[in-house]
């Protein structure tokens, strides 16, 4: 997620020694994060001692919920990370760190995790955090009466699925004493601690009141002061936070639906950090005063074409490979996103263990693509629909894909829908091709391989290509049980290679996060996981 010369290392930005002129599932609109030193209301500050806004433009709408049990969208997940903690947590660079658990051990058979809890933690209402809160929090999420939005991160726990279905009250969570909890799994799952850093695994009090969503009680570094829906959320720092209180007194998350508005505010100096809209990437990179402010990092995010392998010609791997070969992906990346990413030759981002950075993507070759179609029995080409969301830049990208495919006798009809309708159609198996992106839930190659290509996840689970291969499934399943990191990475590489050879989906590129940062901001780290930035290390100097 150095110095201010971010062209050398665009990952972390420190404050300069002098003042400079004032002047990012979820992708193009704006959630404004405002950092102030007092509990000042939203708006422009005039005194030099006060602070301005910090914008994260990946989110443009209100959080759906501040209750971890119902935090299924990115804005909610980020807000939950401010207010609550899990046993583990993500750093901005996606490393998994101890959270409410200071350490843990795993049994030799990989089934029992013993978590040792911190003794210096209190909820914001003053209640000490204890091991019983782990058991009650997990039981609450899994209780059918809670109607939690996304409980699958807890499914590895023994008895969790039966508990969630209401057929059992037995759950593999045992409190040994106030500071020790043992979690037993159904089967070994080596990356289980990463799942515990997700919002749904956050700790909440034993008793949840009716106003919990509007007045949440957590252990996190921030406390909610005010939530003006569709306008802003105001947070005050938790001075007693066990991990060290934030340096800034107040954090305000303003909702800005229009990226152009966010850009204008940044250039007016009223916000501190801007998530650069995709369609403005080149403008920011090519303008000297703007480019000096840029900070970037590879995100755990893949753009791809889901190819429904159960429909007509798309059942044939030669047709799927022809689609991939008909696309000049480097040119698409350069012209539409100003090179803001890296061409993909698989689904695992290069920064994750298991990625094969030496694998080359299929080269653009329209003649070879037409030959493959002929071999597959389609000498006159094929007709398909390409679905995409109405959110920029997907329509433009879809039009470019349409033009390339036409050169190889792949005739495309573009179907634009709102994101929810498009997603529902794809998961129901109603699409031929669907243009999508995938943003990691947790930083592990498994979170790309399993959701996107495992047969158990077809349809509603997210495998909208309906790809199914027994060898691929076996490799991923074996990786769940493998405790040796090097061997697990090799299983990931083998699965990714097989999925790419079979073109279970057509990977396009891995995306880069790109922010603009005001010169008075210190310690900002570009987050590569959605809930990795909690603003603990950010400081604001004089303008």
How should these model regions be labeled?
Residues 515-543:
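Long beta-strand-rich cores associated with HINT superfamily self-processing modules
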Residues 58-108, 139, 215-219:
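N-terminal lobe/hinge region of extracytoplasmic solute-binding protein
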Residues 210, 238-284, 402, 411:
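Ligand-site clamp/hinge motif
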Residues 237, 315-403, 407, 468, ...:
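Append "and occasionally in soluble cytosolic enzymes with long acidic Gly/Pro-rich linkers
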Residues 47, 353, 374-441, 513:
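Ligand/substrate-recognition segments at binding pockets and active sites
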Residues 43-54, 97, 123-187, 206-225, ...:
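Surface-exposed, Gly/Pro/Thr- and Asp/Glu-enriched linker/hinge segments
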Residues 43, 173, 407, 411-422, ...:
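Extracytoplasmic/peripheral linker and loop segments enriched in polar/acidic and small residues
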């Amino acid at each position: 997620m150095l110095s201010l010369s971010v062209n050398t290392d665009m990952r972390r930005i420190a404050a300069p020694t002098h003042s400079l002129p004032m002047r990012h599932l979820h992708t193009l609109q704006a959630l404004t994060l405002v950092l102030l030193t007092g509990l000042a209301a939203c708006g422009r500050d005039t005194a030099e001692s006060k602070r301005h806004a910090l914008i994260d433009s990946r989110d443009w709408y209100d959080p759906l919920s501040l209750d971890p049990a119902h935090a299924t969208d990115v804005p909610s997940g980020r807000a939950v990370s401010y207010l609550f903690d899990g046993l583990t947590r993500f750093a901005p660079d996606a490393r998994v760190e101890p959270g409410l658990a200071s350490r843990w051990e795993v049994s030799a058979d990989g089934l029992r995790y013993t978590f040792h809890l911190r003794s210096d933690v209190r909820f914001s209402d003053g209640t000490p955090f204890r091991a019983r809160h782990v058991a009650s929090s997990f039981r609450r999420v899994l209780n059918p009466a809670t109607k939690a939005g996304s409980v699958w991160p807890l499914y590895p726990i023994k008895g969790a699925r039966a508990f969630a279905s209401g057929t059992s009250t037995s759950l593999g969570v045992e409190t040994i004493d106030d500071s020790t909890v043992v979690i037993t799994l159904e089967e070994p799952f080596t990356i289980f601690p990463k799942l515990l850093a997700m919002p749904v695994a956050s700790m909440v009090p034993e008793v949840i009141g009716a106003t919990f969503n509007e007045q949440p009680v957590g252990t996190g570094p921030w406390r909610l002061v005010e939530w003006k829906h569709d306008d802003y959320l105001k947070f005050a720092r938790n001075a007693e936070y066990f991990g060290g209180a934030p340096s800034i007194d107040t954090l305000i998350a303003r909702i800005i639906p229009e990226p152009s508005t966010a850009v204008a505010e940044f250039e007016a100096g009223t916000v501190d950090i801007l998530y650069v809209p995709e369609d403005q990437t080149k403008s920011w990179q090519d303008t000297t005063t703007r480019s000096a402010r840029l900070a970037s990092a590879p995100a755990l995010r893949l753009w791809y074409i889901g190819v429904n392998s159960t429909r007509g010609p798309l059942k044939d791997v030669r047709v799927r490979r022809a689609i991939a070969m008909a696309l000049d992906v480097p040119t698409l990346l350069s012209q539409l996103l100003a090179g803001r990413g890296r061409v993909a030759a698989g689904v695992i981002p290069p920064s994750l263990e298991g990625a094969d950075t030496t694998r080359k993507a299929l080269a653009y070759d329209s003649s070879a693509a037409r030959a493959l179609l002929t071999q597959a029995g389609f000498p006159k080409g094929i007709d398909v629909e390409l679905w995409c969301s109405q959110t920029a830049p997907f329509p433009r990208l879809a039009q470019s894909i349409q033009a390339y495919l036409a050169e190889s006798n792949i005739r495309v009809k573009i179907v634009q829908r709102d994101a929810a309708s498009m997603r529902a159609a794809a998961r129901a198996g109603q699409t031929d091709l669907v243009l999508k992106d995938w943003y990691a839930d947790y930083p592990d190659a498994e979170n790309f391989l399993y959701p996107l290509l495992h047969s158990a996840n077809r349809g509603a689970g997210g495998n909208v290509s309906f790809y199914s291969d027994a060898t691929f499934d076996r490799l991923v399943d074996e990786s769940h049980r493998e405790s040796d990191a090097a061997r697990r990475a090799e299983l990931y590489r083998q699965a990714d290679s097989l999925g790419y050879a079979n073109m279970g989906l057509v990977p396009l590129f891995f995306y880069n996060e790109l922010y603009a940062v005001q010169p008075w901001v210190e310690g900002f780290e570009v987050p590569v996981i959605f809930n990795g930035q909690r603003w603990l290390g950010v400081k604001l100097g004089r303008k």
